[in-house]
From Swiss-Prot:
It comes from Yarrowia lipolytica (strain CLIB 122 / E 150) (Yeast). O2 binds at residue 250. GO terms for cellular component: mitochondrial inner membrane; respiratory chain complex IV. The lineage of its organism: Eukaryota, Fungi, Dikarya, Ascomycota, Saccharomycotina. This is Cytochrome c oxidase subunit 1. It holds the Pfam family COX1. The keyword Electron transport applies. It comes from the Eukaryota. Its main location: mitochondrion. One of its GO terms (molecular function) is metal ion binding. Component of the cytochrome c oxidase (complex IV, CIV), a multisubunit enzyme composed of a catalytic core of 3 subunits and several supernumerary subunits. The complex exists as a monomer or a dimer and forms supercomplexes (SCs) in the inner mitochondrial membrane with ubiquinol-cytochrome c oxidoreductase (cytochrome b-c1 complex, complex III, CIII). It catalyses: 4 Fe(II)-[cytochrome c] + O2 + 8 H(+)(in) = 4 Fe(III)-[cytochrome c] + 2 H2O + 4 H(+)(out). Binds 2 heme A groups non-covalently per subunit.
Length: 535
């Protein structure tokens, strides 16, 4: 293919599948940088006395800020919503493409300058050491006088605008592009998950944009929205930020719920238990996500009755979440379970996400949250939900659908090695953090008393294991793309190809009840030029 055609295909692409591939590549690139930054954090905390950054606390704060923003905005969201959402949602609905194809293109390309801005913000002057929450007055002009915070805020603006355009696209596609005969109750769970994610993005992102814009004005135009001296209030920023932030954590995990539902159905060889209950549970989680934002703010001095309300409302979210957990377990019960790597990641997700949810119930209590606030207990909680929830669902989705997407099989044995290294690594990293938090170790501080050294060293060891697991995954994908046997010529190739690591033929072919399994492998660029008809 000529250079001109390549540029037309990949730079000016209006095809959802090509854009999804771009999202996957972008997410992998961002994840590699974000993982490198997490390695710096764990090297710094591997011992007392700031062994890696030599006491440069600002540099440490810049690293944790960049790590969080990269992992959330440039890894998990592009992979789950941009990658799997763009590729699978039109296929599951029987649509030829997304509703707004060119809007889809700009949604992706806005992320590239956004990533450049956030990386630049970490490199100019002293960097943006605000934490990813960008709290004022720490993010104000007195504390961060250079352009770093402005660059970080513009990065979040661009990323948010990209997500907003994508959300409009997904909602329109879901409502208008379903194929003939596909009623709402026939829509697969992953497509529902992407719809709810898009609705949450649409309702929450404008509020974040407002808060960040006020921050830009405070920094550069002498307003005082968050400045006490001028009659402003820094707590207002927290309300605006967390109004977006709490739905955001569900934006990160709800597409994962959709993927796990499909994976559990695949490995148990039976339909998901209680599909309508699953849909209502996701809707309830999304709706309740807007009613609990101040549980992040128990330590700022809320009234006791306000704290009582937010404690109760937060605990209510455990109900629809547990409906999902028990429905997955009920799906597995009595099924013919195939313990392939998709199954391992799905079961790992259910187990570890449940642990993260239980620590969330602990933190929902305002009386308990005040001592736990900003301690490593909170870090352990949200990493169990994200590092082992969202990220495990991404791996699970890759191992479930990549043979269909690429038409190439991955090496089953290597992928098992990836799972076990990852499972051990993340648990060894984050489980000790519960103990550190209970002992009172504060987060975002780059040194600590000698009493905390034991569990910190264990956590740093775990992070090394996780990094090795990530390298193994990159090799699995490389091996899949170079040695993965095409489904078309699979029968012709010798089943006993001599290879130390085994053959890529161990993968069991899976076909499911949803429309994406009915098209060719790999799917053509416009899989449904003629609408599929469901009876």
């Amino acid at each position: 293919m000529s250079l001109k055609l390549n540029i037309q295909r990949w730079l000016f692409s209006t095809n959802a599948k090509d854009i999804a591939v771009l999202y996957f590549i972008f997410a992998l690139f961002s994840a590699m940088i974000g993982t490198g930054l997490s390695a710096i954090i764990r090297l710094e905390l591997a011992n007392t006395g700031s062994p890696f950054l030599h006491g440069n606390t600002q540099a440490f704060n810049v690293v944790i800020t960049a790590h969080a923003i990269l992992m959330i905005f440039f890894f998990v969201m592009p992979a789950l919503v941009g990658g799997f959402g763009n590729y699978l949602m039109p296929l599951m609905l029987g649509a030829s493409d997304m509703a707004f194809a060119r809007l889809n293109n700009i949604s992706f390309w806005l992320l590239v300058p956004s990533l450049i801005l956030i990386l630049t913000s970490a490199l100019v002057e002293a960097g943006a050491g605000t934490g990813w929450t960008v709290y004022f007055p720490l993010a104000g002009i007195q504390s961060h006088s250079g352009p770093a915070v402005d660059l970080a805020i513009f990065s979040l603006h661009l990323s948010g605008f990209s997500s907003l355009l994508g959300a409009i696209n997904f909602i329109t596609t879901f409502i208008n592009m379903r194929t003939i005969g596909m009623k709402y109750e026939n829509v697969p769970l992953f497509a529902w998950a992407v719809l709810f994610t898009a609705i949450l993005l649409l309702l929450s992102l404008p509020v974040l944009a407002a808060g960040l814009t006020m921050g830009i004005f405070d920094r550069n135009f002498n307003t005082s929205f968050f400045e006490y001296a001028g009659g402003g209030d820094a707590v207002l920023y927290q309300h605006l930020f967390y109004w977006w932030n709490h739905p955001e954590v569900y934006i990160l995990i709800i597409p994962g719920f959709g993927i796990i539902s499909h994976a559990v159905s695949a490995i148990a060889s039976k339909p998901v238990f209680g599909v309508q209950g699953m849909i209502y549970a996701m809707w309830s989680i999304g709706l309740l996500g807007f009613c609990v934002w101040s549980h992040h703010m128990f330590a700022v001095g809320l009234d006791s009755d306000t704290r009582a309300y937010f404690t109760s409302a937060t605990m209510v979210i455990a109900v629809p979440t547990s409906i999902k957990i028990f429905s997955w377990l009920a799906t597995l019960y009595g099924g013919t379970i195939r313990l392939n790597v998709t199954a391992l990641f799905a079961l790992g997700f259910i187990f570890l996400f449940t642990i993260g949810g239980l620590t969330g119930v602990v933190l929902a209590n305002s009386a308990l949250d005040i001592p736990f606030h900003d301690s490593y207990y909170v870090v352990a909680h949200f990493h169990y939900v994200l590092s082992m929830g969202a990220v495990f669902s991404i791996f699970c989705g890759w191992y479930l659908w990549s043979p269909k997407i690429l038409g190439l099989h991955y090496n089953e044995r290597l992928s098992h090695i990836h799972f076990w290294l990852m499972f051990i690594g993340v648990n060894v990293t984050f489980f000790p953090m519960h103990f550190l938090g209970l002992q009172g170790m504060p987060r975002r501080i780059n040194d600590y008393p000698d009493a905390f050294i034991g569990w910190n060293q264990v956590a740093s060891l775990g992070s090394i294991i996780s990094i090795v697991a990530s390298i193994v995954f990159i090799y699995v994908v490389y091996d899949q793309l170079t040695n993965g046997l095409h489904q078309g010529n699979k029968a012709l190739d010798s089943q006993f190809k001599p290879s130390f690591m085994g053959t890529n033929l161990n993968v069991e072919g899976y076909t499911g009840p949803t429309l994406e399994w009915t098209v060719s492998t790999p799917p053509s660029l416009h899989a449904f030029n003629t609408p599929a008809v469901l009876y």
